[in-house]
């Protein structure tokens, strides 16, 4: 598992790159503020209920949460179940809002 910075992710989004973003927060957190992607709460990943993203196993996926802790857990679990190109957003949405406003 590797990390991606807020500035690198923002640059890639601004360039129009199609990214596979996975928000591992809870639905209410996602609804409050998100940067897109698929909502798959950490609990679903930990119980391997990942049907909505199973077709991404060989593609780059970028996990994010509020602070980077849940997405770190999710990233490690995704690697355990066969995902090969997992990135974790450093600092999560807290860092995003701090740096991007």
Model regions and ranges:
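Rhodanese-like catalytic fold shared by cysteine-dependent sulfurtransferases
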Residues: 1-20, 24-62, 66-101
């Amino acid at each position: 598992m590797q990390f991606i910075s807020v500035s690198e992710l923002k640059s890639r989004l601004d360039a129009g790159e199609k990214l596979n973003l996975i928000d591992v927060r809870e639905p209410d957190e996602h609804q409050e503020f998100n940067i897109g992607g698929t909502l798959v709460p950490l609990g679903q990943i930990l119980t391997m209920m990942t049907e909505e993203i199973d077709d991404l196993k060989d593609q780059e996926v970028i996990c994010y949460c509020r602070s980077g802790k849940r997405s770190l857990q999710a990233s490690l679990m995704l690697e355990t179940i066969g995902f090969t190109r997992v990135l974790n957003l450093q600092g999560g949405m807290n860092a995003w809002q701090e740096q991007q406003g």
